[in-house]
Curated annotation (Swiss-Prot):
<dbReference type="InterPro" id="IPR018181">
    <property type="entry name" value="Heat_shock_70_CS"/>
</dbReference>
<keyword id="KW-0143">Chaperone</keyword>
<comment type="function">
    <text>Chaperone involved in the maturation of iron-sulfur cluster-containing proteins. Has a low intrinsic ATPase activity which is markedly stimulated by HscB. Involved in the maturation of IscU.</text>
</comment>
<dbReference type="Pfam" id="PF00012">
    <property type="entry name" value="HSP70"/>
</dbReference>
<dbReference type="InterPro" id="IPR043129">
    <property type="entry name" value="ATPase_NBD"/>
</dbReference>
<dbReference type="InterPro" id="IPR042039">
    <property type="entry name" value="HscA_NBD"/>
</dbReference>
<keyword id="KW-0067">ATP-binding</keyword>
<dbReference type="InterPro" id="IPR029047">
    <property type="entry name" value="HSP70_peptide-bd_sf"/>
</dbReference>
<dbReference type="InterPro" id="IPR013126">
    <property type="entry name" value="Hsp_70_fam"/>
</dbReference>
<dbReference type="GO" id="GO:0016887">
    <property type="term" value="F:ATP hydrolysis activity"/>
</dbReference>
<dbReference type="GO" id="GO:0005524">
    <property type="term" value="F:ATP binding"/>
</dbReference>
<dbReference type="GO" id="GO:0016226">
    <property type="term" value="P:iron-sulfur cluster assembly"/>
</dbReference>
<dbReference type="InterPro" id="IPR029048">
    <property type="entry name" value="HSP70_C_sf"/>
</dbReference>
<comment type="similarity">
    <text>Belongs to the heat shock protein 70 family.</text>
</comment>
<dbReference type="GO" id="GO:0140662">
    <property type="term" value="F:ATP-dependent protein folding chaperone"/>
</dbReference>
<keyword id="KW-0547">Nucleotide-binding</keyword>
<dbReference type="InterPro" id="IPR010236">
    <property type="entry name" value="ISC_FeS_clus_asmbl_HscA"/>
</dbReference>
């Protein structure tokens, strides 16, 4: 029996009718498109039999070229040849200039601080450049399948944030594509291998592409793919190997650091060729800018060893997040062209204690998995037994009184997901509530990331705690968040979709998770202090209201005792002694017990006035 049947509304295929769908691996260095034909997933080649499409676009005044043709212009027209645009997706111009100071492009900032690249075709943003790559892939698929595509699944790094995911969807829309779903790249690889092997157990997906590194721990059980945890670094990949080797060649050749763009591109091309050759050979001869020399695999390994070590540290963190030991991992799936580097395979095998899987071409495995998923989502496989569960990278929650963060959805919760939690008002007569959406693992607002703010108005004017507001967090299959707040008695509501202009990198996410562990004890103490201060404020607010209304119920001496207790509480609440605040609250409660009882008696008498015992 099928565990889950998924199809887009109106796209469920009629009997004997297949809809055309494709999986697209929109990569940093290379991109691919794949489809399912005769029950087999396969990548689609161009007229020359090449499956990879370089993620490069060359712009001219009268048009543009994509792929191999564009790449040949890289050395001749560097400023108009855009490569690795995926690294720019969802980032601010300031962030790009800080992270990638040596890019050969000229940038301008848009009104909201986002990057615009100066080209012969005008100012272009990363979304437009990505759309041109997607158009080229779609054209290849349309020609190969002899028909228009009904839908596509596009893969993204597991740590892409909301802005980067939304940018990818916008690029697809600009390219005229109907996006069935965005799919995490490691998850796509798990689909490809899971269907082939039919095994059950824990799998690690080690994805080292041109521009990003992702590590995911998945559990396969009875056809269910569950992502236990993800991690990685969106600013680490094979491109970094290339640049390290290019810098090494430049030093050996005595080429000035500030040489022109053409020489820089020539150096990079020589480094890429050398890296590829060193996957099979022990040494390689390099000719560049009139210099000739030899580079050994051992020298190359020394250059990249620190970067490979960084990937393994991320693996260790993600295993801990998943609650899994390395020896529990049944298989290690290698994804991305950079996993062909012998040192990478060797170190990964040593770390997990088993040789990694490489039976599916690591360049193609993600596109193949995306094609399989697209075939299901478009309605061609109504009996599919595969259920896919992704996760969110950081906890989502709300700011509460005292600058605290109340987590609504913990990190590594599977998506799509919807969670609701009830909150209430703090003050008497409160008719509005500010909703502050937070992301992070720490206990205090100041240590987490603000995602969005909105207000819920029209709350009934009731005593503090009288109104009940249900806040619902919903994360869709693409990892995009919407938050809705509703007052339960009236049904009044407000909502917001969280689409930040640019977001966190995965290394920043990893740093936030690490900080939450490092400061765990300190954060708990800070939360306890903040909670006691909030409670002190609530007690004093309630007491002042009661005294204003019914002070006549107290003698002068009784009033003085209560005032003294309240003054002491107000004083200690300004400090950092949790126990002192707690004791002062208890003292106020003790000194006001008789006063509270008299107020209750008075309220009862007022309620019964004019009524007989029989009526009661």
């Amino acid at each position: 029996m099928a565990l889950l049947q998924i199809s887009e509304p109106g796209l469920s295929a009629a009997p004997h009718q297949r809809r055309l769908a494709a999986g697209i691996d929109l990569g940093t260095t290379n991109s691919l498109v794949a489809t399912v034909r005769s029950g087999q997933a396969e990548t689609l080649a161009d007229h020359e039999g090449r499956h990879l499409l370089p993620s490069v676009v060359h712009y001219q005044q009268q048009g543009h070229s994509v792929g191999y043709d564009a790449r040949t212009n890289a050395a001749l027209d560097t400023a108009n040849t855009i490569s690795s645009v995926k690294r720019l997706m969802g980032r601010s111009l300031a962030d790009i200039q800080q992270r990638y100071p040596h890019l050969p492009y000229q940038f301008q900032a848009s009104e909201n601080g986002l990057p615009m690249i100066e080209t012969a075709a005008g100012l272009l943003n990363p979304v437009r450049v990505s759309a041109d790559i997607l158009k080229a892939l779609a054209a290849r698929a349309t020609e190969a399948l002899a028909g228009e595509l009904d839908g596509v699944v596009i893969t993204v790094p597991a740590y892409f944030d909301d802005a980067q995911r939304q940018g990818t969807k916008d690029a697809a829309r600009l390219a005229g594509l109907h996006v069935l779903r965005l799919l995490n790249e490691p998850t796509a690889a798990a689909i490809a291998y899971g269907l082939d092997s039919g095994q059950e157990g824990v799998i690690a997906v080690y994805d080292l592409g041109g521009g990003t590194f992702d590590i995911s721990i998945l559990r396969l059980s009875r056809g269910v793919f569950e992502v236990l945890a993800t991690g990685g670094d969106s600013a680490l990949g094979g491109d970094d190997f290339d640049h390290l080797l290019a810098d090494y060649i430049r030093e050996q050749a005595g080429i000035p650091d500030r040489s022109d763009n053409r020489v820089q591109r020539e150096l990079l091309d020589a480094a890429i060729a050398a890296k590829i050759a060193l996957s099979d050979a022990d040494s390689v001869t390099v000719n560049v800018a009139g210099w000739q020399g030899e580079i050994s695999r051992e020298q190359f390994n020394e250059l990249i060893a620190p970067l490979v070590k960084r990937t393994l540290l991320a693996c260790r963190r993600v295993l801990k997040d998943a609650g899994v030991e390395a020896d529990e991992v049944m298989e290690v799936v290698m994804v991305g062209g950079s996993t062909r580097v012998p040192l990478v395979r060797e170190r990964v095998g040593e770390f997990f204690g088993r040789p990694p899987l490489t039976s599916i071409d690591p360049d193609k495995v993600v596109a193949i998995g995306a094609a399989i998923q697209a075939d299901i989502l478009v309605g061609n496989k109504p009996d599919s037994e595969m259920l896919l569960l992704d996760v969110i990278p950081l906890s989502l929650g709300l700011e509460t009184m005292g600058g605290l963060v109340e987590k609504v959805i913990p990190r590594n919760t599977t998506i799509p997901v919807a969670r609701a939690q009830d909150f209430t008002t703090f003050k008497d007569g409160q008719t509005a509530m500010s909703i502050h959406v937070m992301q992070g693992e720490r206990e205090l607002v100041q240590d987490c990331r603000s995602l969005a703010r909105f207000a819920l108005r029209g709350i009934p004017a009731l005593p503090a705690g009288g109104a009940h507001i249900r806040v619902t967090f919903q994360v869709d299959a693409d990892g995009l968040l919407s938050v809705t707040a509703m007052e339960k008695s009236t049904g009044v509501e407000a909502s917001i979709q969280v689409k930040p202009s640019y977001g966190l990198t995965d290394s920043e996410i990893a740093s936030m998770i690490k900080d939450s562990m490092s400061y765990a004890e300190q954060d708990v103490k800070a939360r306890m202090l903040a909670e006691q201060k909030v409670e002190a404020a609530r007690v004093l607010e309630s007491l002042h209201g009661a005294l204003a209304a019914d002070a006549a119920l107290l003698s002068t001496a009784e009033r003085q005792v209560i005032d003294d207790a309240a003054a002491h509480l107000s004083e200690v609440a300004q400090g950092d002694d949790v126990d002192a605040i707690e004791q002062a609250i208890k003292n106020v409660d003790k000194q006001t017990q008789d006063f509270a009882a008299r107020r209750m008696d008075q309220s009862v008498r007022r309620a019964l006035k004019g009524h007989s015992v029989d009526e009661v």
